[in-house]
Amino acid sequence: MTRPPEKPSDQKDSFWKTKTLEELSSAEWESLCDGCGRCCLEKLEDEDTGKIYFTHVACRLFDVGACGCSDYPNRSAKVPDCVRLTPENVRTLNWLPPSCAYKLVAEGRDLYWWHPLISGDPNTVHEAGVSVRGRVVATEDEVDDADLEDHIVRWPTLLPKRARMKRRA
């Protein structure tokens, strides 16, 4: 659910601790997205094992500078295979990164210190090394499908060390 970074939610309470994903308002749902951009990376699936591999190639709508979708409201029409996260599918998508707030909330866990709802700063996701900023090498329009295997990377499935810290360094 990557979108261009916005001001953090003006929620005074920690709604993600008291509500289920199904109970969230649209604004609360959208504010859970930390703007990391990991879900906008192209992924490959091993047909034999079902294992998902991330690449450092982004969707054609991904704005590398803003680290978000360049046409978020129309993304599904322009990119038919864009996965819209829902309360149902975040519990079953096996490729969501370990830092994904939707996944964390679905598992009853709290958000990390760098999440904009916690820090009050949309840049902490970048400071913590969680976002794809500076790591995307191309968009899908620039790489042939046959060459995507050459762009497989492991980092999107990992949580950076500084992101695991309890607070900002």
Curated annotation (Swiss-Prot):
<dbReference type="InterPro" id="IPR008228">
    <property type="entry name" value="UCP006173"/>
</dbReference>
<protein>
    <recommendedName>
        <fullName>UPF0260 protein OCAR_6616/OCA5_c14500</fullName>
    </recommendedName>
</protein>
<dbReference type="Pfam" id="PF03692">
    <property type="entry name" value="CxxCxxCC"/>
</dbReference>
<dbReference type="InterPro" id="IPR005358">
    <property type="entry name" value="Puta_zinc/iron-chelating_dom"/>
</dbReference>
<comment type="similarity">
    <text>Belongs to the UPF0260 family.</text>
</comment>
